[in-house]
């Protein structure tokens, strides 16, 4: 595909249901980054990509362009790191499960580099609830990176690292639908973690997201689509998984019944706003929360412990995570990170 191809020509390919090759996908993202695509065209591209569905090649190519313009202020930590960032956009209004999972997995020994943002198309994002709990996201990038070594977990606030995409946030919010940027968010962690557990809001995203992460060189990945449409493993029924390991994709499923726990409908995980999210997150992390909340976090944490190489047996990982929750260890991990980041209050290299 020629670099002389126009925006309109690229759009026509998508509108006709065609897939973009690696070069054209990269070019499209470069033009977004260089402000060569208008808001009207952006809306059309986002809608066309959503209607067609993105391929692994399109996603990985666009993600690599975003990572090229995201330079680290210091060397990447020489650690085996895991991310728990998912696509969001499932519309279920559950509490921030993946955020809780990050602290639980860290309390079990995983090194977590959690990439996240404020809400784009949902109600409350991971950054929203962490800010409301007092976590300082306005600190130097060096401090953010060093927290992985010092505490075992860090949070990378996406707009700080991907400033070029801030201008698209109002349009994404106005559209109110899942877009390619929901899919790209989990693929562009600046620390380039070695492994990831990635929740997707649509079953159709399982294969392309797994393929994208495989193409980007991830060691171990689980892409999960939860029963009832959650972008997490749920307690309601069968959860569909794609394992990425040793250069291959493997499809599987898990059900909380396999862990000798009962099925619970997704509406038991729903909250009404950020205040409730804060309360639920804290109660899960300190071990005082509802059984259903603790169980769903432990189930997803088991997936992270597999990705981290800590526990290959998901049943043992589930029990390990649940034990840590009931001991209140994840809340202690959160407080350590909160204290560590509070001593630095200047966004700078």
Curated annotation (Swiss-Prot):
5-phospho-alpha-D-ribose 1-diphosphate binds at residues 86, 89-90, 94, 96-99, 114-122, 126. The keyword Mitochondrion does not apply. Mg(2+) 1 binds at residues 98, 232. NCBIfam families: trpD. Its EC number is 2.4.2.18. GO terms for biological process: L-tryptophan biosynthetic process. Pathway: Amino-acid biosynthesis; L-tryptophan biosynthesis; L-tryptophan from chorismate: step 2/5. It is an enzyme of class 2 (transferase). Belongs to the anthranilate phosphoribosyltransferase family. The lineage of its organism: Bacteria, Bacillati, Cyanobacteriota, Cyanophyceae, Synechococcales. It holds the Pfam family Glycos_transf_3. InterPro entries: Anthranilate_Pribosyl_Tfrase, Glycosyl_Trfase_fam3, Glycosyl_Trfase_fam3_N_dom, Glycosyl_Trfase_fam3_N_dom_sf, Nuc_phospho_transferase. Catalyzes the transfer of the phosphoribosyl group of 5-phosphorylribose-1-pyrophosphate (PRPP) to anthranilate to yield N-(5'-phosphoribosyl)-anthranilate (PRA). This is Anthranilate phosphoribosyltransferase. Its cofactor is Mg(2+). Gene3D superfamilies: Nucleoside phosphorylase/phosphoribosyltransferase catalytic domain (3.40.1030.10), Transferase, Pyrimidine Nucleoside Phosphorylase, Chain C (1.20.970.10). Homodimer. Anthranilate 1 binds at residues 86, 117. Anthranilate 2 binds at residue 172.
